[in-house]
Amino acid sequence: QENGVVGAGGAGFPTYMKLTDKANTILMNCAECEPLLKLHRQLLEKHAYEIMKTFHMIQETVGASEAIIGIKKSYVQTIHALNQHIEEFPGMRLHLLDEVYPMGDEVVLIYEATGRVVRPGGLPIEQGVAVFNVETLYNVYRAVEEHKPVTSKYVSVVAEVENPVTVKVPLGCTLEEVVAQAGGTTVKDPVYFVGGPMMGRIGNGSDPVTKTTNAILVLPKDHVIVMKKQRTSSIDLKRAASIC
């Protein structure tokens, strides 16, 4: 709480509040369902021991009997890194997931990994489960072991850039500044898409990086994804009505 650790994706739920819940199962989400994003698998591969150690610490803190790492079976290198340390942490196991969308959604992930169903609008803790993002766990590690607050963010910069890459940047820097770290754009009049192509939003080059910014997709303004996001709700409702 003192170091400002929140969920590093989604709604940015304060992490300390999850640590007060007595979950019997904790789940690490390493199932990036959005195309092109590689942030979590890369971070977990590079810092496997630190993140697993933190996950085990949380397991003991909340009194969970089981700690599950939900990871797509296609993340071979990351799985190899995890298997180097898994025996050091009793009660922790890997659950390999298929490469389907939207596996990274926590409700879907909970069902696939545990068989439990979270009701519509409900919270995972109602089913005795607490879910943690990979980068969130790494931030907890840095807060506990190194006493460092969250002042930076890992961001995947992909699509129409010179060198697609995952970078670590200070919170508050602009999207344009982050894209420059990937060598700049390769299209005229680029559109900055914050997040993945399925659930992301159109941003502005001057928008700041926040604690929940996971990715920046640079797309041409006439890309089908951009055009769909620019449709008004009335157009979408008309399409829905015609389909019905």
Regions found by a protein language model. Name each.
Residues 1-68, 73-90, 95-110:
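Iron-sulfur-cluster electron-transfer modules
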Residues 23-24, 152-154, 213:
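Short glycine-rich loop/turn motifs
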Residues 65-175, 181-186, 196:
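Hydrophobic alpha-helical positions that pack around
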